[in-house]
Swiss-Prot record:
This is Large ribosomal subunit assembly factor BipA. Residues 7-202 form the tr-type G domain. The lineage of its organism: Bacteria, Pseudomonadati, Pseudomonadota, Gammaproteobacteria, Enterobacterales. It comes from Buchnera aphidicola subsp. Baizongia pistaciae (strain Bp). One of its GO terms (cellular component) is ribonucleoprotein complex. HAMAP family: BipA.
């Protein structure tokens, strides 16, 4: 088997923690390489194509691009930085020969940095460390380098991996340098580092064709697009191939078009060589991990390893009285087809049918992972109901065990006591407390169960007035210490009739608690309209107006002033509900409701539970 290297090709991924600037870095690499032509419009965060990505400032789906710099073609994959989307990260690492590990010059390595770096080390990849945001006030690059070295040691890095090259950048300003004291006004030092320290791919030009599907895309005209790196040989358009999963021959097919990345475009080519990352069309029902190979030399590549889901939710057809009034897709078949389509692309997601034909079990890597899916479906016109997230338990060595997570909280000092108390209530363990160099903020390192984290993100944001930073990643499984985690949530106010809420009635209810609705809001019997001041649920009438009389008032009526209702976001709703409640999601509304809408049904259920 003749082995060579393609000296003018580099395959590299960019991995980093959320909001450490990797997407902006890719923008600048594309811009300064000359890959964009003069007539092409440039916008910031060009690699984030998903609306949710731009709104939240995070990367959810891995993106592929390539730049031509001098004689070198550099394939770049911008990967997610959040562990909930780690399924994307793992597949990407199977396609590249090096990674740019982007770390904030002030914050240093964070939990997701640890997560993706550990994955990279497991593939034997040597990283190029990029200390980004070097222009930040109070940047501390030397401290960050020490933190990265300690992290690598803890992850059992080899001597070669510990001898990592470092480049300093400000992606925002488009500058880089091998020393933070001597910065170039461009990205040339970073281009040079990529070419110098990324090994050119090993190629087998004379072997039969073989590649593995690491990503899937879809085009309305081209259909399913399979993306992967050619492991051996070469491929031409219209070539006959076999599609296999592990060692089982599945079927034969024919490749349609071969597409190569350049900038933000896919360019059609007639032939692609070993080592390159390409996209192919013409093959239906492709799956992640499928091996595409020469029919005469069938050989499957090892299946890609993906961490298992840790959280599950039930997705159901919307059965509320307002069902079908706001959405376009409302049937169980439409919801199931959409979920199965998502499962094809979203490899960390698992869909199962249940005994109820209108309900499906959806499991993923965390609350954020599933809430992104729900939000996307909502924007596409779907109506559905979802349950409270439940942690997936495992039986290991005849013991029931639950997933544990490493959590890092970055908070202002004044909130430290409150947050530490909350962590204790959720059975978490604080392993380290680190004040920052200005003694204004504190970093808390904790180990806490995934079960305890459900709803904590929203509570944490409220307790820190939005100023706290929250990071988490899966750590390990361990025996359940306590079956019950105390939830300090009051009871709820439940509407007893269907109609439009009246301001006069809501005004009188304000003394009972905080409301989710305002005057004129349509409500139905069994809908949750507010939070009760006490721990019990209370059924209320929010439709009654002021009694009319035939007597003229001696003075003017008092003006009714309603307090601003609590803003209902998807994350808040999912974390707020109890097991006997559901979140109703439509393109226009997010409502909370009881599973049983009739008050007498709820009373019977409560009585049976007590007995």
């Amino acid at each position: 088997m003749q082995k060579k290297t393609n000296k003018n090709l580099r395959n590299i991924a960019i991995i980093a923690h959320v909001d450490h600037g990797k997407t902006t870095l890719v923008d600048k690499l594309l811009q300064q390489s000359g890959t964009f032509k003069k007539h092409e419009e440039f916008s910031e965060r060009i690699m984030d194509s998903n609306d949710l990505e731009k709104e939240r400032g995070i990367t959810i789906l891995a993106k592929n691009t390539a730049i031509q710099w001098k004689k070198y073609r550099i394939n770049i994959i911008d990967t997610p930085g959040h562990a909930d989307f780690g399924g994307e990260v793992e597949r990407i690492l199977s396609m590249v020969d090096s990674v740019l590990l982007v770390v904030d010059a002030l914050e240093g390595p964070m939990p997701q940095t640890r997560f993706v770096t550990q994955k990279a080390f497991s593939y034997g990849i040597k990283p190029i460390v990029v200390i980004n945001k070097i222009d930040r006030k109070h940047a501390r690059p030397n401290w960050v380098i020490d933190q990265i070295f300690d992290l690598f040691v803890n992850l059992n890095a080899t001597d070669e991996q510990l001898d990592f090259p470092t480049i300093y950048t400000s992606a925002l300003l488009g500058t880089s340098g091998v020393s933070y004291n001597h910065m170039n006004p461009d990205m040339i030092p970073l281009y040079n580092a990529i070419v110098k320290y990324t090994p050119p791919p090993t190629v087998y030009p004379n072997c039969p064709f073989q590649m593995q599907i690491s990503q899937l895309d879809y085009d309305n005209y081209l259909g399913i697009i399979g993306i992967g790196r050619i492991n051996k040989g070469s491929v031409t358009s219209n070539q006959s191939i076999s599609i296999i999963n592990n060692t089982e021959v599945k079927r034969t097919g024919k490749i349609g078009k071969i597409l190569q990345y350049l900038g933000l475009n896919k360019i059609e080519i007639n032939e692609a060589q070993s080592g390159d990352i390409i996209a192919i069309t013409g093959i239906d029902k492709l799956n992640i991990s499928d091996t595409i190979c020469d029919p005469q030399y069938i050989s499957a590549l090892p299946m890609l390893k993906i961490d298992e889901p840790t959280v599950e939710m039930l997705f159901s057809v919307n059965k509320s009285p307002f069902s079908g009034t706001e959405g376009k897709y409302i049937t169980s078949r439409q919801i199931f087809n959409r979920l199965k389509k998502e499962e094809n692309y979203n490899v960390a997601l698992k869909i199962k049918e249940t005994n109820d034909t209108n309900t499906f079990s959806v499991s993923g890597r965390g609350e954020l992972h599933l809430s992104i899916l729900i939000e996307n479906m909502r924007r596409e016109g779907f109506e559905l109901e979802v349950s409270r997230p439940q942690v997936i338990l495992k039986t290991i060595n005849e013991l029931i065990q639950e997933p544990m997570e490493t959590v890092v909280l970055d908070i202002e000092n004044k909130y430290q006591g409150t947050i530490m108390k909350t962590i204790g209530q959720r059975k978490g363990t604080i392993s380290n407390i680190t004040p920052d160099q200005n003694n204004e903020r504190t970093r808390l390192d904790c180990i806490i169960s995934s079960r305890s984290l459900i709803g904590f993100r929203t509570e944490f944001s409220t307790l820190t007035s939005g100023s706290g930073l929250f990071y988490s990643t899966f750590s390990h499984y361990q025996k359940i210490e306590s079956n019950k985690i105390k939830r300090h949530r009051n009871g709820v106010l439940i509407a007893n009739k269907t109609g439009q809420a009246i301001g006069f009635s809501l005004f009188n209810l304000q003394n009972r608690g905080k409301l989710f609705i305002t005057h004129g809001t349509k409500v139905y019997e069994g809908q949750i309209v507010g939070i009760h001041n006490r721990v019990n649920d209370l059924t209320v009438n929010c439709l009654s107006g002021k009694k009319l009389t035939n007597m003229r008032a001696s003075g003017s009526d008092e003006a009714i002033t309603l307090t601003t209702p609590i803003k209902m976001t998807l994350e808040y709703a999912i974390s707020f509900i109890n097991d006997d409640e559901l979140v109703e999601i439509t393109p226009k509304s997010i409502r909370l409701r009881k599973r049983y809408l009739k008050e007498n049904e709820r009373k019977i259920l409560l009585r049976n539970i007590k007995e």
